[in-house]
């Protein structure tokens, strides 16, 4: 039985019911339906903190999913898991791969900026101001892209860009 069918969370159950109805109504191939089932189960496992199970489901969804737009969200969620696990290099890779398929994911740009900013802070603590500046410059570029896609969002990033005189 798919994981999402046994989940006790009301929102997850509601999402599952709506998704199942849509899958029946919208013409899709069996592969697309199976890919979505793995994606949905991955989201369910991820929301419960079961990252290993979520990754297994996402990798299986990636194997089956052919639509670049849908693949971008799978890759983005894999990036989220790696971010949560402190695997920032892997996370950046998956966010980048998601953006290659869908350049309109401001949340991926934001998460990449947060990682770069964090690495800049680490470089400062290690006394490497040159490396810190490089990381901060990269964070600024990613935040600018996120803000361009969704003006009015990422207020803290906008404030940081303004305070550090990186906002044009």
UniProtKB/Swiss-Prot annotation:
Q: Which UniProt keywords apply?
A: Chloroplast, Membrane, Photosynthesis, Plastid, Repeat, Thylakoid, TPR repeat
Please verify whether the record's keywords include Chloroplast.
Answer: yes
Q: Which domain of life is it from?
A: Eukaryota
The record's TPR repeats, renumbered to this chain, cover 35-68, 72-105, 120-153
Q: Name one GO biological process term.
A: photosystem I assembly
* Principal subcellular localization: plastid
Identify the GO cellular component terms for this protein: chloroplast thylakoid membrane
Q: Which Gene3D superfamilies match?
A: Tetratricopeptide repeat domain
InterPro entries referenced in this protein's UniProt entry, alphabetically:
PSI_Ycf3_assembly, TPR-like_helical_dom_sf, TPR_rpt, Ycf3/AcsC/BcsC/TPR_MFPF
Compartments, record wording: Plastid, Chloroplast thylakoid membrane
* One Pfam entry name: TPR_1
* Membrane topology, record value: Peripheral membrane protein
Among its keywords, does the record have Repeat? yes
Q: What is this protein's function per UniProt?
A: Essential for the assembly of the photosystem I (PSI) complex. May act as a chaperone-like factor to guide the assembly of the PSI subunits.
Q: Which PANTHER family match?
A: CELLULOSE SYNTHASE OPERON PROTEIN C (PTHR44943), TPR REPEAT-CONTAINING PROTEIN MJ0263 (PTHR44943:SF8)
NCBIfam families noted in UniProt: PRK02603.1
The UniProt subunit note reads as follows: Interacts with Y3IP1.
Q: Which family does it belong to?
A: Belongs to the Ycf3 family.
User: What HAMAP family does the record point to?
Assistant: Ycf3
- Protein name (record): Photosystem I assembly protein Ycf3
Naturally occurring in which organism (per UniProt): Arabidopsis thaliana
Gene for this chain: ycf3
